[in-house]
């Protein structure tokens, strides 16, 4: 058990260093998936040995470790293949090389710089769906990679590789799901495309304007609700299709609501760290909520317990909002402090990886 624990600690330490580095070098992302593969192997072996915990970490079921290991092998192989092309010189983020992005339509393709397309069904302003058009789509064709662009027409969203046109969003099928009249309107920038009487008729094609694309690095940490065009990493308020939240997508953060509904006036954010507690709520405990991909938070929590245990009081396991109205699907870790001074000392000393975001707040003592 000690040998597995030491190897797992070393593996997770390397993972956290990669998250903190937040590199755009494709070689680093290949290394990231090698570490993920190694971690899955160790956890799988630990479960076979009958272990339920390794230190403070729960050992997942065999099926979970096996599935994650298969995903890691798949990503490692495709990234190593991409590494042998001219596209390896381009900047790549953790999110762009994540398994969640790999499975986002169009599936099993790498993609960058997405733009939102709004589709209105039955002419009803309240019945809309958002889809994503990707400026760059990297498609594997005969053991090589080709970079193509998404296009929009009245039938759907597609890319063309060679002589083949591949639709990854079909508006006819979407209209059957979300509408009743089989009528839809595609709103893309200043262009509006209406559903034709016969979908097989000549349709208008729209390419992506280079000047209006978004990248993960351009996404602000706090997103204003009045923004007209959301970045791909930020789920819009309406129902969305074609965009999944990325595994290390903490670069873009939805606003966290109050932790204690009785203390709405106590919640602070990154842009107001000097706000103090209301005198009438002196029993509230200072907290920090960290958001990010589950594995990032798990490694971060391990480092906090190992190196900075004197800088906080309690730390939670990773948790998620279960409601369908949840503002995001990130994992969350909550840390409590004895005082605001201790919390500030924590923030001054601890290096928080750029792939993990945080919010300040307070929690009533009776909740702890």
UniProtKB/Swiss-Prot annotation:
PTM field: Phosphorylated.
Positions with biased composition (Polar residues): 208-226
Region span, Transactivation domain: 1-200
Keywords, comma-separated and alphabetical: Activator, DNA replication, DNA-binding, Early protein, Host nucleus, Phosphoprotein, Repressor, Transcription, Transcription regulation
DNA-binding domain: region residues: 284-368
SUPFAM superfamilies for this protein: E2 regulatory, transactivation domain, Viral DNA-binding domain
InterPro entries in UniProt: E2/EBNA1_C_sf, Nucleotide-bd_a/b_plait_sf, Papillomavirus_E2_C, PPV_E2_N, Reg_prot_E2, Regulatory_protein_E2_N, Regulatory_protein_E2_N_1, Regulatory_protein_E2_N_2
Subcellular location(s) per record: Host nucleus
GO BP: any one term: regulation of DNA replication
Family: Belongs to the papillomaviridae E2 protein family.
Functional description taken from the UniProt entry: Plays a role in the initiation of viral DNA replication. A dimer of E2 interacts with a dimer of E1 in order to improve specificity of E1 DNA binding activity. Once the complex recognizes and binds DNA at specific sites, the E2 dimer is removed from DNA. E2 also regulates viral transcription through binding to the E2RE response element (5'-ACCNNNNNNGGT-3') present in multiple copies in the regulatory regions of the viral genome. Activates or represses transcription depending on E2RE's position with regards to proximal promoter elements including the TATA-box.
Full protein name: Regulatory protein E2
């Amino acid at each position: 058990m000690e040998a597995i624990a030491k190897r797992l600690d070393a593996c997770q330490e390397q993972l956290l260093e990669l998250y903190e580095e937040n590199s755009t070098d494709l070689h680093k992302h290949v290394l990231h998936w090698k570490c993920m593969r190694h971690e899955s192997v160790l956890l799988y072996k630990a479960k076979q040995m009958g272990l339920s915990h390794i230190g403070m970490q729960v050992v997942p079921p065999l099926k979970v470790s096996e599935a994650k290991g298969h995903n890691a092998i798949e990503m490692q192989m495709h990234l190593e293949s991409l590494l042998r092309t001219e596209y390896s010189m381009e900047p790549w983020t953790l999110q762009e090389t994540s398994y969640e992005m790999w499975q986002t339509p169009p599936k099993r393709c790498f993609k960058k710089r997405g733009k939102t397309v709004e589709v209105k069904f039955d002419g009803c302003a309240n019945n809309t769906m958002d889809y994503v058009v990707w400026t760059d789509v990297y498609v594997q064709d005969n053991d090589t990679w080709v970079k193509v662009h998404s296009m929009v027409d009245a039938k759907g969203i597609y890319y063309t590789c060679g002589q083949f046109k591949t639709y990854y969003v079909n508006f006819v099928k979407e209209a059957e799901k979300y509408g009743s009249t089989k009528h839809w309107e595609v709103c893309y920038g200043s262009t509006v495309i209406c559903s034709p009487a016969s979908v097989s008729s000549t349709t208008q094609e729209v390419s992506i304007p280079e000047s209006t694309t978004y990248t993960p690095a351009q996404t602000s940490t706090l997103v204003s609700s009045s923004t007209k065009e959301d970045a791909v990493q930020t789920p819009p308020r309406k129902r969305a299709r074609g965009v999944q939240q990325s595994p290390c997508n903490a670069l873009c953060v939805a606003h966290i609501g109050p932790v204690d509904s009785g203390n709405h006036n106590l919640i602070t954010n990154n842009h107001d760290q000097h706000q103090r507690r209301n005198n009438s709520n002196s029993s509230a405990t200072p907290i920090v909520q960290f958001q990010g991909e589950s594995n990032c938070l798990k490694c971060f929590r391990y480092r906090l317990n190992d190196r900075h245990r004197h800088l906080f009081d309690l730390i939670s396991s990773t948790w998620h909002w279960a409601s369908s109205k949840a503002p995001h699907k990130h994992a969350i870790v909550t840390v409590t402090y004895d005082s605001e001074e201790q919390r500030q000392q924590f923030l001054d000393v601890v290096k928080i990886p750029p792939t993990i975001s945080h919010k300040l707040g307070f929690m009533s003592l009776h909740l702890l």
